[in-house]
């Protein structure tokens, strides 16, 4: 009888520990859920079915900042909650498998690694991008700007249409900073300064 009571006690403890482990991961989240190892066509299909943009982490195996994002940023619950609720998330090594094809397709938008692209699954166009290691809150803010229509593509289109308001110049330069495009930013600032009347 004593052995049965001890076994039941041990089983009860084991069950309690198991429940606590499951609850810990349920309550605290597991960070960003990436569709890893999926074909690009499957990622596009999933995003279209869910009515979401695609968040694509473009990385390489030798990139230190890429590893920093993978270890310190994407696993954070607040980053995972934001990304998982707003995007279909995928990641590709740009030097292997499907990543090679995707790098060729988007190389004009990948100035270095890591680059995080927001892609419209309907036409596979770039909606927004963030380049370089980015802290969790800054990444969420930059991506929220993209969801709010404050994207590099929108600012570029307005600029190319001839708009030169100070507000646009500031927003465009901020988006260029996030996209790590200092050359274009310098040109826009220089053109804006040169366009100012001398008597102002």
Where are the regions a protein language model picked out?
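Bacterial Sec-dependent N-terminal signal peptides
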Residues: 1-32
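N-terminal "domain-start" segment that seeds a small globular fold
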Residues: 28-45
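Thiol-based oxidoreductase modules, predominantly thioredoxin-like and allied folds used
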Residues: 33-38, 58, 76-99
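Short active-site neighborhood of thiol/selenol oxidoreductases, capturing the structured segment around
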Residues: 49-61
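Conserved redox-active cysteine motifs that mediate thiol-disulfide chemistry
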Residues: 58-74
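Non-catalytic, surface beta->alpha helical segment in thiol-disulfide oxidoreductase systems
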Residues: 110-152
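Oxidative protein folding and maturation machinery
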Residues: 156-200
